[in-house]
Amino acid sequence: MQYAHPVAFQRNLNDNWREFTERVLQPLFDYLTERVGAESSVLYVLERYVRRVEWFDRQALYDQAMANSQRAEEVYDTDLRRFLFSEGMNMPFSQAKSASGLSDVVSELDTDDPLVCELKIFDGASRGKRHLGSGVNQAVQYASDYGKHTAYLVIINLSGRQLALPNDGDPKVWPPNIDVASVRVYLIAVRALPTKSASKQGKPAPVNITQANLVDPDTIDGAGE
């Protein structure tokens, strides 16, 4: 009887661990795997969008945008939505209402995993760092509305200068990202100025954009910032 007791105890302990693993650990592992997989899938699609614009559609989109510069952002936003839809992302609404207002791209609202993606133009003039900061703020607000911890900011760079973006992640891994209020915001820069226009500017110094610029507009000074 004294021998049987530790054997029974060991069996019960193993059963308890097995139950704990099945009920607690396995769902956690499944969730983390699904989340990482979903982020990787979205980033893959957005990387394809960057290449498509830079390699094939840069001039055409720019011409459309400049035909009515006040609606330039709408041109690129519509193009992004169309591309995401063609890549299999369910997007029933182009701008869906949330508690914070309207998000540029909120897809799969009928599922438990909506995609929150903002798009902003950066031209170094009227649409500068403060404009990008508003995009980060909107992305974080919409992510919070939908209970998400991941958001994406697509930056249409029309400045002709490289953007040195802040990064809380691995500097060797694309794209850079920042963590704001428990939301990870991926920063997707697209070189959208036609190459002929960019070449006339030579090789200007990169635009240094800090995390403070994106989350605290009071740190930004000077015209065109």
Predicted segments with their positions:
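Active-site metal-binding core of divalent-cation-utilizing nuclease and nuclease-like domains
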Residues: 86-113
